[in-house]
């Protein structure tokens, strides 16, 4: 059976950009069991509460990544909320660990996808936003939308 080509997104973490200011991003492989891969290929995963940590041995683990049980799995189905190991180079792990050590910083997954047949997760170091940061972002987005609307109306009125 030939390996699938390209990128197919399984899940996105839209809350991450709302709750965190996103810094550098990395692509990491996932260590998965067979039924987890089958469940992901069916498009079932939730990244909402997921986060990653670097342990004392220098390994990166993903927590709270919800991959539901495979519907046609038998008694050998996987644990839904188990911690999953992320595959990164030693240099990448060291840089990720240095960046995530600061106060208020955490490693958050942005999206989960298949790339050339392998399950990958895009992770980033995020700094938690406070409520006033979120309100300010909403104000900026609304102002930008109003400016675009005014520009579109001006262009529309010129054509008449």
UniProtKB/Swiss-Prot annotation:
The keyword Membrane does not apply. It is found in: Cytoplasm. One of its GO terms (cellular component) is cytosol. GO terms for molecular function: RNA binding. One of its GO terms (biological process) is trans-translation. Pfam families: SmpB. Required for rescue of stalled ribosomes mediated by trans-translation. Binds to transfer-messenger RNA (tmRNA), required for stable association of tmRNA with ribosomes. tmRNA and SmpB together mimic tRNA shape, replacing the anticodon stem-loop with SmpB. tmRNA is encoded by the ssrA gene; the 2 termini fold to resemble tRNA(Ala) and it encodes a 'tag peptide', a short internal open reading frame. During trans-translation Ala-aminoacylated tmRNA acts like a tRNA, entering the A-site of stalled ribosomes, displacing the stalled mRNA. This is SsrA-binding protein.
């Amino acid at each position: 059976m030939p390996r699938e080509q390209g990128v197919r997104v399984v899940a996105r973490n839209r809350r991450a950009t709302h709750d965190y200011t996103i810094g550098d991003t990395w692509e990491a492989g996932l260590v998965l069991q067979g039924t987890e891969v089958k469940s992901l290929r069916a498009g079932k995963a939730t990244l909402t509460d997921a986060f990653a940590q670097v342990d004392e041995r220098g390994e990166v683990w993903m927590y709270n990544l919800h991959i539901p049980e495979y519907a046609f799995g038998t008694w050998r189905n996987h644990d839904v909320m188990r911690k999953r190991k992320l595959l990164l180079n030693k240099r990448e792990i060291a840089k990720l660990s240095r960046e995530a050590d600061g106060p208020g910083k955490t490693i958050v997954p942005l999206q989960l996808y298949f790339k050339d047949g392998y399950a990958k997760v895009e992770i980033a170091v995020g700094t938690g936003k406070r409520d006033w940061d979120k309100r300010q972002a909403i104000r900026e987005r609304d102002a930008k939308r109003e400016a675009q609307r005014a520009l579109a109306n001006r262009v529309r009125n010129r054509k008449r």
